[in-house]
Amino acid sequence: MASFIASDQDVKNFLTAPSMNDQEGIGFAYATDEAVLKALIPAPLKLMAPVVCGYVVHMGKPTFSAPYLEESLFALVSYKDKMMGAYPINLLLHGPGAESGVIAGREGAGIPKKLADDIELRRNDNSATATVERHGKTLLNVSWTAGELNDPSIMKQFAGQLALGKEAEMNSFFYKYDIDQHEDGTNHFSNVQLVATQLRSLADQVEPGNLSIQLESTDDDPFGELKVLKPLGAAWFHFDTSVMFNTLKLDEVDAATTMPKLLTGRYDRSFFNPKAATYII
């Protein structure tokens, strides 16, 4: 019988080894303005290349929710010039499992996640398209056509991650923090930490191809800030399994300098300005 009191076993099993299995869609990369992208990366992480990577995928069998669609833009970064991985700038989710996916990611792992108004991913023979809509605009419009990459050299960066039939490990960097409320109702951020989540994924389908991409911005989602200077390529891929198997606590960082770079990917303008409102009847 259902109850508002969780069992001890449920508490023990809460978000244990979250997995994003049966993951399929479009991965892509494009060159952008190095100074702009570098400014978005909080210390002590360092930008490795002026390249924005991303994906729009269907999460078919997540272990923590119903299926959903997910979009992400991320940069390739390093920590102390030794540890390399992805630094996600944003993720938007849509579909039956989207709310659980946002909660699991943002509250559980420090991932910059929000809900999209709509995400569509369509494939037909040797081409595919994906669109991401939020607050009245199509923020991302991506097209993939099987064949030659726009820039074949880009595949070298992802050869290990996308090797067919071979488990690959990847690091993703996130910042976790506490929100403390004062007696007067104001809030401040504390205990800001850099963590690395290690994932183990198994790709069983990778089809390289040509990328076409357009970005737009709203006040809540400034995708257009990351201008497309040159499309580098795309691939249709399928991960049979993708498991978060380890989390490393790397550094405590300064809240005053770090939090301004974290908020937009997690919260809308209404969190900062009560006059920022949308009315749809």
Curated annotation (Swiss-Prot):
A Pfam family it matches: ADC
Enzyme nomenclature, EC number: 5.3.3.-
SUPFAM superfamilies assigned to the protein according to its UniProt record, in alphabetical order: Acetoacetate decarboxylase-like (SSF160104)
Example GO BP: response to toxic substance
Xref: Gene3D superfamilies: Acetoacetate decarboxylase-like
Subcellular location per the Swiss-Prot or TrEMBL entry: Cytoplasm
Entry superkingdom: Bacteria
Alphabetized GO MF terms: isomerase activity; lyase activity
Coiled-coil intervals, chain numbering: none
InterPro entries noted in UniProt: Acetoacetate_decarboxylase, ADC_dom_sf
UniProt catalytic activity: 10-oxo-(12Z)-octadecenoate = 10-oxo-(11E)-octadecenoate
Enzymatic class: isomerase
Pathway(s): Lipid metabolism; fatty acid metabolism
Gene Ontology CC annotation, any one: cytoplasm
Entry keywords, A to Z: Cytoplasm, Detoxification, Isomerase
Family: Belongs to the ADC family.
Described purpose of this protein according to its UniProt entry: Is involved in a saturation metabolic pathway of polyunsaturated fatty acids, that detoxifies unsaturated fatty acids and generates hydroxy fatty acids, oxo fatty acids, conjugated fatty acids such as conjugated linoleic acids (CLAs), and partially saturated trans-fatty acids as intermediates. CLA-DC catalyzes the migration of the carbon-carbon double bond in 10-oxo-(12Z)-octadecenoate to produce 10-oxo-(11E)-octadecenoate, during linoleate metabolism.
Name of the protein in question: CLA biosynthesis isomerase
Lineage, highest ranks first: Bacteria, Bacillati, Bacillota, Bacilli, Lactobacillales
Gene that this sequence comes from: cla-dc
